[in-house]
Amino acid sequence: MQRLFAGKLRFAFRHFPLTEVHPWAEPAAEAAEYAATQGLFWEMHDSLYANQDELGLPLILALGRALGVSDLGLRDALAQRTFASKINDDFIGGVRSGVNGTPSFFINGEKHQGSFAYEELAAAIDARLHAGAAP
């Protein structure tokens, strides 16, 4: 999408950990935020997502190590819940915006109710652009 709508699209990621479904979702989000301090947010996010069914502290730390994330720093950030308030703020903001699951997409502040298929999202963004509203 970002390539298709280069210069016309702003992408904002928000955490929405569903802890009742994934007990390690919140620590995983915190780990991704710590990795972001080292420029490795998306790499950590993708590794955590790919391994979401096996997550636990040992695996989160191992994934971080594999990416070159500081092991001691990550342990500290998780133990002290350094990024917990940011994750909570993202979650509360999502609830207030009508998010009740993931993934959720908003186009120009309006929740996309259709399919998440590439073609449908692209068509919805394109329709907004042609209506004069920047997504």
Predicted regions and their residues:
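C-terminal cap of thioredoxin/glutaredoxin-like
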Residues: 1-2, 58-135
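Structural alpha/beta surface segment adjacent to cysteine/selenocysteine redox centers
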Residues: 1-65, 126, 131-135
